[in-house]
């Protein structure tokens, strides 16, 4: 039996019929909507999820990263402080530890929205199913 997802405003999609590239495209569309719904629901802009393009070290191929505004801000401030000799450059693990309270607030905001919004829960469910399908290929 084929897995069918009902995607907002797009009807039904049979996941098994999608190529890896098409799956990635569907994931991108759902992620964009998921983050937009979340960002519209919050009052604290520091919790907003920001997506941006970057070029990984050693590559010429652009990649996209999506992360909370507080992570982007802290990483930038830490890099400037390290460059000026005021602080050590934080590793990703150190950054997560330093920002534990902010991550807890983000988790609470997402949980609250999930409890209040069936649409947000549906987007999350579709996104999980698409990612699982892509990972299984």
Model-derived segments and spans:
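Primary mode marks residue(s) on the alpha4-beta5-alpha5 output face of response regulator receiver
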Residues: 19-36, 42, 83-137
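Extracytoplasmic, post-signal-peptide low-complexity/disordered regions of secreted/exported proteins
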Residues: 51-53, 61-62, 68-71, 76-100, ...
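N-terminal secretory signal peptides
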Residues: 5-75
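Sec-dependent N-terminal signal peptides
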Residues: 1-3
């Amino acid at each position: 039996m084929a897995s069918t997802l009902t995607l907002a405003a797009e009807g039904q999609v049979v996941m098994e019929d999608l190529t890896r590239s098409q799956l990635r495209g569907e994931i991108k569309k759902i992620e964009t909507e998921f983050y937009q719904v979340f960002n519209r629901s919050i009052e604290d802009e520091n919790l907003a999820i920001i997506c941006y393009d970057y070029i990984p070290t050693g590559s010429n191929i652009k990649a996209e990263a999506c992360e909370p505004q507080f992570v982007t801000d802290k990483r930038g401030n830490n890099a400037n402080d390290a460059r000026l000799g005021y602080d050590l450059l934080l590793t990703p693990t150190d950054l997560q530890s330093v920002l534990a309270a902010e991550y807890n607030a983000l988790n609470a905001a997402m949980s609250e929205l999930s409890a209040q919004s069936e649409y947000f829960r549906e987007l999350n469910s579709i996104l999980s199913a698409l990612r699982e399908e892509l990972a299984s290929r």
